[in-house]
Regions:
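An N-terminally biased module of ancient metal coordination in phosphate/nucleic-acid-related enzymes
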Residues: 1-72
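Active-site environment of divalent metal-dependent phosphoester hydrolases
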Residues: 11-14, 38-41, 100-104, 129, ...
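Short, acidic/polar
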Residues: 13-22, 101-112, 231
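Active-site gating/metal-coordination segments in enzymes
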Residues: 49-164, 211, 221
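Catalytic pocket-lining loop regions of alpha/beta-barrel enzymes
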Residues: 118-120, 127-128, 132-246
C-alpha cells in the first residue's frame, strides 16, 4: 500500500538524499514537506524548538506581530525546500511556509510556485485570522495558480497566545475563493466537531453546482490517542474518504520512528474498528492527498 504523509516539516539542515533515505526507512512513497518558518532564519530560537514555533522577538515575547518579517527570509526558506524537492520531485512535494506579513509575500509565493516548482503554501495563523483582508490577495494569487493551501487549525503549542486564531470556523471566508483548495490540519483538535461542521458548510456552498468541496482534512496528530478513534469515526463518514488525509507531523529525520507507528494505528482503526474496505483505506493513505494536489487518482 502506498503511503503519502501530507504533513512534514523541514529543520533546515536536511538534504534531499537525507530525506529520501528516511522516507525509505519509514515506508513512505511520498511526503509533503513544508519549508522552515521564514522568521526563524533571522530570529533567536529555543534550543528545543524543532519546528520554529517560538522565535523570540526583540522584547523576548514568543511569536506575535513584532517579529521581523523579511522578504529575504521567505525567499531563503523557499530555496531550501526547493533544493530538497529537486532531488526527487515525484516523491518530495515541497510547500512554502509563508508569513503573510512579510513584504512582497504575494510575489514571493508566485516565485516559489512558478519559478521554483513548489506545490503550494503552508500557514499557521499567528495573531492574524484567515478572514483578515490582508489574506485576500494571497488567496487570489494561489487560486489563480491552481495550488492548495495547508493551514494549522486547532490548539497551537507555540506562537504565544495564538490558538484563538486557529478555530476552524474562522476559515469560512475562504468560500469567497471557491477555486482555492485548502486543508485544515490536526482535524482542528480539540475542535473536531467544529472542523467537521465547517467541512459541511463548504459542502453546502457547492451543493447542486457540480463543483467539489474545496476543503480537506489533514488528520495528522494533534488528536491524542484517547480521542483518535472518535475523531476518525466522525470525520470519515461525514466528509468521505476523498477529503480525509493521512499525516504524521514530524521532521524528516524522525519519520522512520514515527510514521510506521502512526500508519499502523490509523490502519487498525480504519480497518479493524470501522470496517473500511482496502480501497477506502488506500484513499486515506494516498488518494485523498492526490486529489488535494489536483492529481488524477
Amino acid at each position: 500500500m502506498r503511503i503519502w504523509d501530507c504533513h512534514c516539516h523541514c529543520r533546515g539542515n536536511e538534504t534531499g538524499d537525507d530525506v529520501l533515505r528516511w522516507m525509505d526507512e519509514a515506508g513512505l512513497e511520498r511526503i509533503t514537506l513544508f519549508s522552515l518558518y521564514p522568521p526563524t532564519l533571522s530570529a533567536k530560537r529555543e534550543p528545543g524548538d524543532t519546528y520554529g514555533l517560538d522565535p523570540f522577538d526583540a522584547s523576548g515575547r514568543l511569536g506575535g506581530p513584532s517579529l521581523a518579517y523579511r522578504r529575504e527570509d521567505v525567499r531563503a526558506a523557499a530555496e531550501h525546500v526547493a533544493k530538497v524537492q529537486a532531488v526527487d520531485p515525484k516523491r518530495i512535494y515541497g510547500m512554502l511556509w509563508a508569513e503573510p506579513r512579510a513584504p512582497g509575500i504575494v510575489e514571493e509565493i508566485e516565485r516559489a510556485i512558478v519559478d521554483m516548482g513548489l506545490r503550494g503554501v503552508k500557514m499557521i495563523p499567528d495573531h492574524w485570522s484567515a478572514g483578515d483582508e490582508m489574506m485576500f490577495p494571497i488567496y487570489e494569487k494561489i487560486q489563480e495558480l491552481g495550488k492548495p493551501m495547508h493551514f494549522h487549525s486547532g490548539i497551537l503549542y507555540g506562537f504565544g497566545d495564538s490558538s484563538r486564531f486557529c478555530r476552524p470556523a474562522l476559515f469560512e471566508p475562504l468560500m469567497h475563493f471557491p477555486r482555492l483548495r485548502f486543508a485544515l490540519a490536526h482535524i482542528s483538535w480539540p475542535w473536531v466537531d467544529e472542523c467537521i461542521a465547517v467541512y459541511g458548510r463548504f459542502g453546502a456552498a457547492v451543493h447542486g453546482t457540480g463543483r467539489e468541496n474545496q476543503m480537506w482534512i489533514d488528520t495528522c496528530r494533534g488528536t491524542p490517542d484517547a480521542w483518535r478513534v472518535e475523531a476518525l469515526a466522525k470525520a470519515v463518514p461525514f466528509c468521505g474518504m476523498e477529503h480525509v488525509m493521512f499525516g504524521v507531523d514530524t521532521v524528516p529525520s524522525s519519520l522512520p520512528k514515527s510514521a510506521p507507528v502512526h500508519a499502523r494505528k490509523d490502519k487498525d482503526i480504519l480497518e479493524g474498528m470501522m470496517g473500511l474496505t482496502e480501497a477506502q483505506v488506500e484513499t486515506f493513505f494516498w488518494g485523498a492527498n492526490a486529489r488535494f494536489h489536483g492529481e488524477k487518482v
